[in-house]
A protein has these predicted regions:
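IMPase-like, lithium-sensitive Mg2+-dependent phosphomonoesterase catalytic core
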Residues: 1-139
């Protein structure tokens, strides 16, 4: 199970597009309703991964660190899952501004470790991007 707004696929960086395609090839099903708490509950109950990546066109994220990410990070930590901003654990992330926003990824430990492994070990080179055509999105 994965949860993310596929309507914004063009706003994701290339690595996220590839990871999404990987999930689809592994026959993960998509469940996204656009309500963070409902999506959070769905991931807790059924497993999987939630992704709200950085928006490359708006040059920012949407979800607020203090009001949305940190409270949910405490809950998911207690249930054995993981929540990061794509790099560091949300619980360890220092708040710099009261309305600071953050990319957000959370889910079962297994799915999050798979995502982190993919993110940390994939090196994009120009030929990958130039010669890449998505089988799913055609771009």
């Amino acid at each position: 199970l994965y949860s993310l707004n596929e309507g914004k696929i063009n706003n994701f960086d290339f690595k996220h597009k590839l990871y999404l395609e990987k999930l689809k090839n592994e026959e993960f099903s998509s469940r996204y309703c656009g309500c963070l708490v409902a999506d959070f509950h769905n991931i807790l109950m059924n497993g999987g991964i939630f992704m709200y990546p950085f928006d490359v066109y708006k040059d920012k994220s949407k979800l607020r660190l203090l009001y949305e990410a940190k409270p949910l990070a405490k809950i998911i930590e207690k249930t054995g899952g993981l929540m990061t901003d794509g790099i560091i654990d949300i619980n360890k992330k220092k708040l710099e501004k009261i309305h600071e926003t953050t990319p957000l990824y959370f889910g079962s430990k297994k799915n999050m470790l798979d995502f982190n492994d993919f993110s940390n070990n994939y090196e994009l080179n120009k030929d990958d991007y130039k010669n890449y055509t998505s089988k799913i999105y055609g771009c």
